């Protein structure tokens, strides 16, 4: 789509220039599109194009779905944009502005404070994690360490080393 000038928003996709690695987990669902002949919306990052495929990227249904997905992600995210170091350079903040999200219609799960961990090579603040899985892709496919993965389920899901160990105790470089 971007090759022909169509902007489809995404949070989980990352194209690591200079490598053959692409992160297309379809985990964020911000990139949903309508595909003719399909009942459900499809994630653009994980949908292979075929000859004659008709894809609609900005219908009312698509835009409403993207806004709801952004609202759901924000519902489980700290409301501290003004004090966040990424303020003004944050993809999630940009999407909230794009979809004119001013109030939170959803309340995320009641979670206890999540881990914040700093090592010599990485700062890991799980309060900011939106489960895009970019870090997992870089760890597994670029660094080829395999130290990170999704553990637990539902609101308890987190991206962490096996058995929820600390990064300093893992194979992380």
Task: List each language-model region with its residue ranges.
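A basic, amphipathic helix-loop patch mediating RNA/tRNA/ribosome contacts
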Residues: 2-36
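Fe-S ferredoxin-like electron-transfer domains
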Residues: 29-173
């Amino acid at each position: 789509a971007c090759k022909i000038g169509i902007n489809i928003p995404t949070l989980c996709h990352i194209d690591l220039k200079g490598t053959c690695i692409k992160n297309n987990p379809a985990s964020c669902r911000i990139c949903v599109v309508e595909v003719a002949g399909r009942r459900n919306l499809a994630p653009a990052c994980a949908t292979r194009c075929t000859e004659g495929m008709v894809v609609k990227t900005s219908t009312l249904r698509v835009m409403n779905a993207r806004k709801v997905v952004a609202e759901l992600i924000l519902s489980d995210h700290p409301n501290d944009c003004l004090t966040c170091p990424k303020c003004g350079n944050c993809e999630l903040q940009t999407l909230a502005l794009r979809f004119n999200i001013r109030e939170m219609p959803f309340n995320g799960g009641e979670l206890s404070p999540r881990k914040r961990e700093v090592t010599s090579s990485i700062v890991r603040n799980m309060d900011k994690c939106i489960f895009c899985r970019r870090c997992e892709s870089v760890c597994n496919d670029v660094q080829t360490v395999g130290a990170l993965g999704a553990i637990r389920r539902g609101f308890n899901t987190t991206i962490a080393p096996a058995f929820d160990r600390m990064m300093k105790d893992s194979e992380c470089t």
